[in-house]
From Swiss-Prot:
A single GO molecular function term of this UniProt record: protein serine/threonine kinase activator activity
InterPro entries (alphabetical): ConA-like_dom_sf (IPR013320), Galectin-like (IPR044156), Galectin_CRD (IPR001079)
Subcellular location: Cytoplasm; Nucleus; Secreted
Name of the molecule in the record: Galectin-9
Pfam families to which the protein is assigned, alphabetical: Gal-bind_lectin
Name of the gene: Lgals9
Induction: By viral mimic polyinosinic:polycytidylic acid (poly I:C) and lipopolysaccharides (LPS) in microglia.
Biological processes, Gene Ontology terms: cellular response to type II interferon; cellular response to virus; ERK1 and ERK2 cascade; female pregnancy; inflammatory response; maintenance of protein location; maternal process involved in female pregnancy; monoatomic ion transport
Organism expressing this protein natively: Rattus norvegicus
Function statement: Binds galactosides. Has high affinity for the Forssman pentasaccharide. Ligand for HAVCR2/TIM3. Binding to HAVCR2 induces T-helper type 1 lymphocyte (Th1) death. Also stimulates bactericidal activity in infected macrophages by causing macrophage activation and IL1B secretion which restricts intracellular bacterial growth. Ligand for P4HB; the interaction retains P4HB at the cell surface of Th2 T helper cells, increasing disulfide reductase activity at the plasma membrane, altering the plasma membrane redox state and enhancing cell migration.
Domain of life: Eukaryota
Length: 354
């Protein structure tokens, strides 16, 4: 099944966020949220509702991190909650990026988290009454994207990526109903990425090209080498995101977090050696390299990538395509002075968020 854009995405929405779903919910509509959970979260809520009052919520999706972590699903009608459906499993990790997808079908919502089927929730009220999405809680959002299998197709003119195009939801066998406790085991699903060109978008702004899906921008949004400031530098819980495509004949590229003339953190994938080098440069002198990784080389020639760097009090944490790959202990301790991002080498940049 092919999916196509139905409305421009909301970029970098400020939490709590409430926005209109153009045309309301429709059968086949998929809503994708990509973001990062705060390091010390309490709760997250995604509501599909009628209007902005919050009195009528068709689907309340509510991860709660207390008591070992679980997810509550519910419906509110005329200001009154119905019976809860709980899944005693937490699909989100503290301080880590996530991709959350909701697929609207005639009888239920299906929910995927990080490419895995998580739960389905049967409609208690007509879904076509829903015209608003609201998001709140302990998270940062990069975007909310809307796509549908019934919209007119637009031919992509740019490369696809690996992290956030509509996923293929598993089908329930006919005659079987989903249980409210335990639900179903997670199932792997293939995913491809939308390329979103944005440079420090206005929070909550919608892109102005509804006729072209996010992956269809033909012009590179960034020049290499790329430099930009990091407002207020780093501090615990501060994170940045860099997405791009590795060139087919790439030898290496690097991401530098700079502190004046020094490099506090140098992240340097080298394709001939199949390693990712980490280091610090102080007064033009490099320190000892760190090369070990728990798994294989996470970057590949000719393929897309998404790098997320989270600052904590003692280290930087790095995830590639949603998978944690390493920690790098701070060698330069004055985190607010680390205020410049540099990206260079054999890649094309598609998205930077600082």
């Amino acid at each position: 099944m092919a999916f196509f854009s139905t409305q421009p995405p909301y970029m970098n929405p400020v939490i709590p966020f409430t926005g209109i779903i153009q045309g309301g919910l429709q059968n086949g509509l998929q809503i994708t949220l990509q973001g990062t959970v705060h390091p010390f979260p309490n709760r997250i809520a995604v509501n599909f509702q009628t209007g902005f009052s919050g009195n009528d919520i068709a689907f309340h999706f509510n991860p709660r991190f207390e008591e070992g972590g679980y997810v509550v699903c519910n419906t509110k009608q005329n200001g009154k909650w119905g019976p809860e459906e709980r899944k005693m499993q937490m699909p989100f990790q503290k301080g880590m990026p996530f991709e959350l997808c909701f697929l609207v079908q005639r009888s239920e919502f299906k929910v995927m988290v990080n490419k895995n089927f998580f739960v389905q929730y049967s409609h208690r009220v007509p879904y076509h009454l829903v015209d608003t999405i609201s998001v709140s809680g302990c998270l940062h959002l990069s975007f909310i994207n809307f796509q549908n299998s019934t919209a007119a197709p637009v031919q992509p003119v740019f490369s696809t990526m690996q992290f956030s195009q509509p996923v293929q939801f598993p089908r329930m066998p006919k005659g079987r109903k989903q249980r409210t406790q335990g639900f179903q085991p997670a199932l792997q699903a293939p995913v491809a990425q939308t390329i979103i060109h944005t440079v420090h978008s206005i929070p909550g702004q919608m892109l102005s090209t509804p006729g072209i899906p996010p992956m269809a921008y033909p012009t590179p949004a960034y020049t290499i080498p790329f430099f930009t400031s990091i407002p207020n530098g780093f501090y615990p819980s501060k994170s940045i995101n860099i997405s791009g495509v590795v060139l087919p004949d790439a030898k290496r590229f690097h991401i530098n977090l700079r502190c004046g003339g020094d490099i506090a953190f140098h992240l340097n994938p080298r394709f001939n050696e199949k390693v990712v080098v980490r280091n610090t440069q102080i007064n033009n002198s490099w320190g000892p390299e760190e090369r070990s990784l728990p798994g294989r080389m996470p970057f590949n020639r000719g393929q897309s990538f998404s790098v997320w760097i989270l600052c904590e009090g003692h280290c930087f944490k790095v995830a590639v395509d949603g998978q944690h790959i390493c920690e790098y202990y701070h060698r330069l301790k004055n985190l607010p002075d680390i205020n410049t991002l540099e990206v260079a080498g054999d890649i094309q940049l598609t998205h930077v968020q600082t």
